[in-house]
Amino acid sequence: MVRRGKEPAKGTLDLPGGFVDMDENAEEGMLREIKEETGLRLQKPQYLFSIPNLYEYSGMTIHTLDLFFRLDVEDDCNATAADDAADAMWLPLNKLDHTQFGLHSISQAVKRFLSENR
């Protein structure tokens, strides 16, 4: 996870991610955003689910469809905060609390993932 370094929801927990560029598919965009925010180079994303969202950006409300993927990482991966992430960290599933995630769709996704994987 990362701690958001910018608004909206600055200072709250988040999952690394962002917007897909015009020449990317969802998987490519997600892998690029994770690399930009954490330095991690990951592969083989497994699609989980999507959640419709309203995202506040530059004074505008943008309708988005947030896509969630599961990625497996090596035990010795070190994430480093970069781009718009203020901090990057690993937390065990049993320490996650969906209410610590400041963006509604992310909070709902974490809640759903935890209910399906505990």
Tell where the protein language model's regions lie, with residue ranges.
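Charged phosphate-binding loop/patch that engages nucleotide di/tri-phosphates or the phosphate backbone
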Residues: 102-118
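N-terminal strand-loop-strand
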Residues: 1-14, 42, 73
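Conserved S-adenosyl-L-methionine
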Residues: 46-50
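Active-site donor-binding loop signature of nucleotide-sugar glycosyltransferases
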Residues: 4, 17, 93
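Gly/Ser/Thr-rich beta-alpha loop segments that engage phosphate groups in nucleotides
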Residues: 13, 19-20
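Unchanged
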Residues: 20-43, 53-104
